[in-house]
Amino acid sequence: MADKITDEYAVGIDPEIYANNPAYSSLFNPYIHKQTIIADHVSVQCHIDLNGIDAVGSKFGNLNAHAGNFTSLCAPNCLPERFALVAYTVEYAFLHDDETDNAADQEALLLENKMLHQALNQSGMTSVSTRVSDKAQRKSEVQAKIAAEYLRLDPVFGEWFLNKWQTFTACVKDVRSLEFPSLDDYLEFRIVDAAADWTLYNFRWGSGITLTPEEEKLADPMSYVAYAELCLVNDLFSWDKEYASHIKSNGDVPLVNAVHIVAVTQGLTHCAAKAVVQAEVRAHEERFCQLKEQYEATDKPSHEVLRWLRLLEHSMAGNWVWSLCVPRYCKVDRNPYKDHLEKYGSDAVRVLTPLDRLCWSKQEIKEMKRNQLKEPSSSTYKTHFSPLEPNPGPEQTRLTISQTQQQRPVLNPYTYINSLPSKNVRQTLIAALNSWYKVPVKSLLIIEGAVNFLHNSSLLLDDIQDGSVLRRGRPVAHQIFGVGQTINTATYLMNEALYLIQMLSPSAVSAYTDEMRNLQLGQGRDLYWSYHTHVPTPAQYISMVDGKTGGLFRLISRLMRSEATKNSDLDISQFATLLGRHFQIRDDYQNLQSEDVTNPHIVSLYAPRANMLLQYTKNKGFCDDLDEGKVSFPVILSMQSPGFSNTALSSVFKGSRKGETLSLEMKQYMLEEITARGAFSETKAVLRKLHTELLSLLMETEKKAGGVENWALRLLIMKLDIVEEKKVAPPKSDSHWGVNQRRAWKGGQKNGRPIDKACFLRAMEEALQK
């Protein structure tokens, strides 16, 4: 079986690079990717994207002129279509690691990782104004680029991978306070701290290897041994640099390295400890080979597991040969980054870019066109745009509402709803558009504040008008503060928003009145349809959405444009309108879907009543749009399906206006009807079409903006996408490495150390004699 594992893209590297080097004693032969130039290109591109062309080579990551690119060596069978993204991500991880290593204290470290979380997840963001510096803007764009591309190539793995990245950085500890009684304790920590599993999972996905949970469990002991070996080799070669940094800082930079741990726990000199670590590396490689041989001898070993083990061998050998002479650890005669840029130029290295390819296939486009609805053109729903005339606003700004004694009662509902968790879509949009418009900080704060007031005002009124019970899993504001007080707060917030917008250019006020008019007209039509149980056509519904939901998105774009210092002629109103459509229809779709209600497997609808009750009380409530009698997009499509009678559905909707919550059985019946009529499938087809149009329009807009790629907007679109296929996501690799450590050495250890390795014993004797 092992002989059938082929190296499709990997080629052996010249033995002269490592064979005669006494520092290389790995049991495995190193390979490199045939298209390693791609990894080199994107490594330089990452530097340009992050810090500009003048800063290329100021720090070191993947590139190694002696042996080759780190990603090319460790993942030499990476699929070509994933290779650039994997290498770019690894390069960024190297640079981010340098940033966190250089953080002045734990607070600075947490701040650095918090910014990464916000960019990847586009939630929990701090004020947009904190991200207007060129450095912060560049970093945010790079992080968004990485996230958007993973979600584009593989939404299921992308979501898992980004969540794993956030979890890892959120758990980073201040190592100054950590103590390790033994090397085993250290390795259990180090595998997580060095993100070994995260990095290798990235390589695994890049290589097209997929393990089932059962296969993952079988491979875990071998994976642990390989991860530990990678960490030990890293510590061995980085020791001199880390020790010098520790001495130079008078001990402020901690020594978190296997060499130091061995020296302290075993009472050895650093020189002797290095010999012990070298022996540990060999012991781990030998143990890996033993475990692999045992697995290969089992009945029907998995082909995918064997591919994974082959990748681990490549990574161990690649990491070792890369470490022999790399700028991250030792001085080199020439800077490989500057040399590469000088040789190929800045245009050639721009491999990871959306402008040279579409993000969907021709077959996908055909499917979407076949299923698409006849939607109104952008001119069907007229908005009232006025000429944009940027003028400086007044000096005084009221960016937040100061809570005086007189204002506090009015602000209580606002304070409450503003404290609830949010998806931050509008704040994300503001930050993304600023990549193009470069709005001054003061104007940016005004826009952010006004949009926050308007959004919360809309939520307060929506909950009253819809008869909602929950908002983001919490009681709605009017149940706490009363309907009258909540309405008063909502109208007060509209006035406060106008007060702020008047500080901007005159065209900003026109944009406010235009879009607030559109928003109220759209909301009015929605309320009318729900109250009278009138079923509009899909085109009428989309026209309503263009006002109700698209209005605030267009207002953001128009306010940003009115204050722009760059690209002031860039009109993205059409994009904002399409974004509003996608956002609302997706919200309609998801409201009628849940973990227990997925299509086409309607059987999951009939879960035990206890499970349904649990789902019912979760978040906003199970299918609460049905309770509110809302004629949402899937409902409209279902009631326009030929060959079906709408009498029963219409009767249920009329009954729901009495203010009574529908029973679970009634909701099950309605969902079954909507599903049987193909409305959910048709809604997904419309969402895919909108997704396609948004990406296409984004690329057109990027060209109009001088080729400035907007990865934050692209990530926002990707996160709004509906994943159609249920793939097997890789298991969450938050397993206890201590358990895998014991499984890996079972039957061959004493006090945690191998006892059947002569090389280990010899090294110990030599170390103790020095």
Curated annotation (Swiss-Prot):
Organism in which the protein naturally occurs: Penicillium chrysogenum
Record-given protein name: Cyclopiane-type diterpene synthase
Pathway: Secondary metabolite biosynthesis; terpenoid biosynthesis
Residues at which dimethylallyl diphosphate binds: R471, K548, T549, Q584, N591, K620, K630
Region (Terpene cyclase): 5-335
Binding site residues for isopentenyl diphosphate: K423, R426, H455, R472
Pfam families: polyprenyl_synt, Terpene_syn_C_2
GO molecular function: lyase activity; metal ion binding; prenyltransferase activity
Residues annotated to bind Mg(2+) 4: D462, D466
Catalytic activity: isopentenyl diphosphate + (2E,6E)-farnesyl diphosphate = (2E,6E,10E)-geranylgeranyl diphosphate + diphosphate; (2E,6E,10E)-geranylgeranyl diphosphate + H2O = (+)-penichrysol + diphosphate
Record-listed substrate binding positions: D97, D101, R190, I191, V192, D193, N234, S238, W239, D240, K241, E242, R328, Y329
Matches recorded under InterPro entries: Isoprenoid_synthase_dom_sf (IPR008949), Polyprenyl_synt (IPR000092), Polyprenyl_synt_CS (IPR033749)
Positions annotated to bind Mg(2+) 2: D97, D101
Biased composition (Polar residues): 374-383
